[in-house]
């Protein structure tokens, strides 16, 4: 496989994780861009990066850049996605990949028009344990899926300027942590949910700080999701089938799953991969998609999850400034 040259736009916590993963893989993190020049310089020195850019467009116009990783706040993603894709760059973009379905559709069309790969950096889809579980489910050992339960809760001190609660930064639980829970649901469900019921509590800033969501698809498979920015919960996902259930803790980057079989109650513990290598798996899968010219990094799931989040926010009447009057 060719040695691809990467650029990272944004050098916060997750940007540092990507750089460390690139080092572990012996990859080529060739350039960095950040709105604060001094921060970008420090980042480049720390990781031995050749090029530092102050302007995103300079990254996009650099012919030596093959893949751009975007880890800026998610309300800014679309403004970087479109010019990067139009410049012929493959893009791996942090979750949530866009604010709404309309933005994602625009980005997807742009990627298709320019023959490049666009993917969301959703760790869950690339962890080896999920691929192993998919094989188990396909074998029929668990029977048909019936129900999924999801929890994800963090405790954040309320601060109107913090990105979690700031409407101008597209804050709220759904786009930040709910995207993981919905991605889990979509991975295990046989088709997209088409019925949605939900309740939400909004923060004083107008973003969602706590929510309960119920989903069902045409096969009768159901899921419940509990999300909160004010109550710590275990990151627990449970998928129940006719013949047993799968339980996964720390599901965004899981490497272990426990399967309990209904008939006799015995349990199997599956282990695959490593939580510490989550971003390495993303990088490898992205480079593989680029090498084979395919949009095969779970893009269909990304689209379905974005459609769900857009519909849920429409139920809540929650919009962001960029949407000019309505979630799209």
Language-model features: where?
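Beta-strand-loop-alpha-helix segment that lines the small-molecule cofactor/substrate pocket
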Residues: 67-74, 78-125
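Short, Asp-centered acidic motifs that coordinate Mg2+ and/or phosphate
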Residues: 31, 51, 67, 147
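C-terminal helix-rich "cap/oligomerization" subdomain common to oxidoreductases
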Residues: 1, 67-69, 218, 285-328
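Predominantly a Rossmann-like dinucleotide-binding segment in NAD(P)-dependent oxidoreductases
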Residues: 125-196, 204
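Short acidic low-complexity segments
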Residues: 51-63
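Contiguous beta-strand/loop segments that form the cofactor/metal-binding neighborhood of enzyme cores
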Residues: 183-254, 273, 283-294, 327-328
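N-terminal Rossmann-like dinucleotide-binding module
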Residues: 1-47
């Amino acid at each position: 496989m060719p040695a691809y040259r990467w650029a990272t736009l944004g050098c916060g916590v997750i940007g540092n994780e990507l750089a460390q993963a690139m080092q572990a893989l012996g990859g080529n993190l060739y350039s960095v861009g950040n709105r604060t020049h001094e921060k970008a310089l420090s980042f480049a020195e720390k990781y031995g990066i050749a090029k530092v850019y102050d302007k995103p467009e300079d990254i996009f116009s650099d012919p030596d850049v093959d893949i751009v990783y975007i880890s800026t706040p998610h309300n800014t993603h679309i403004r970087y996605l479109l010019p990067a894709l139009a410049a012929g760059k493959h893009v791996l973009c942090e979750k949530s990949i866009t604010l709404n379905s309309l933005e994602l559709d625009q980005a997807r069309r742009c990627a298709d028009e320019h023959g490049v790969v666009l993917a969301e950096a959703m760790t869950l889809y690339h962890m080896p344990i999920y691929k192993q579980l998919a094989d188990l489910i396909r074998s029929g050992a668990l029977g048909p899926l019936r129900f999924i339960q999801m929890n994800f809760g963090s405790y954040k001190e309320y601060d109107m300027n913090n990105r979690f609660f700031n409407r101008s930064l597209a804050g709220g639980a759904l786009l930040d942590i709910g995207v993981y829970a919905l991605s889990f649901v979509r991975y295990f469900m046989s088709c997209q949910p088409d019925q949605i019921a939900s309740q939400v509590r909004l923060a004083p800033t107008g973003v969602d700080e706590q929510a309960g969501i119920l989903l069902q698809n045409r096969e009768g498979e159901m899921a419940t999701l509990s999300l909160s920015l004010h109550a710590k919960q275990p990151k627990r996902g449970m998928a129940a089938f006719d013949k047993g259930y799968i339980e996964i803790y720390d599901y965004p980057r899981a490497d272990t799953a426990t399967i309990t079989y209904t008939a006799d109650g015995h349990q199997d513990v599956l282990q695959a991969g490593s939580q510490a290598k989550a971003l390495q798996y993303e990088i490898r899968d992205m480079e593989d998609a680029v090498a084979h010219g395919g949009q095969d990094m779970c893009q269909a799931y990304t689209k379905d999850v974005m459609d769900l989040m857009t519909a849920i926010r429409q139920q809540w009447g929650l919009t962001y400034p960029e949407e000019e009057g309505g979630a799209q």
